[in-house]
Amino acid sequence: YFEENDFYERCLKKEKSIFLIKDSKINHKGNSSVKNIFKDEIEINRNWHLMWSTFYFYEKHFGKITAYKKVLPKLFSAFLKMLFFIIINNKKKRKIYSARLSGIFNSITGNKSWFRPNITKL
C-alpha cells in the first residue's frame, strides 16, 4: 500500500528525477472485479496489509521512532474500535479492526507480510 511512496523515497535518496503529469486521470474502479462473496474477506486483507505496510514503510525510510509515532494512534484506535464492535456484536467490523491490529503487531515484531484472504469458499 506504500509502493509509490517507497519508490519516491528511493528516488530521492539516489537523487533521481521524478516526473509529475499534472493533468493525468486514472479511472480506478476499486474492487469491482471481486465477487460479492469475497468482498468482506478482501476488505479484511486490505486493512491488514495497510497497517502492516504503514509501519514497514516508515521504519524503512525514517526509523523506528517515526514508525511508532505513525502507528501508535492507529493501534489504539483499532483496539478501541475492536472492543466497541465486540460489545455491540458487529462481527464484520470486529474482524476488520482485529486485522488492523494484527497487521500492526506483525510489522512491529518484524514478521513478513504473510496474511492472505480466505477465498477458497464457493
Name each model-derived stretch:
Residues 1-7:
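Conserved glycosyltransferase catalytic-site signature
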Residues 8-9, 13, 17-92:
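Active-site-adjacent helix/loop segment of glycosyltransferases
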Residues 52-53, 74-122:
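Terminal low-complexity segments of carbohydrate-biosynthetic enzymes
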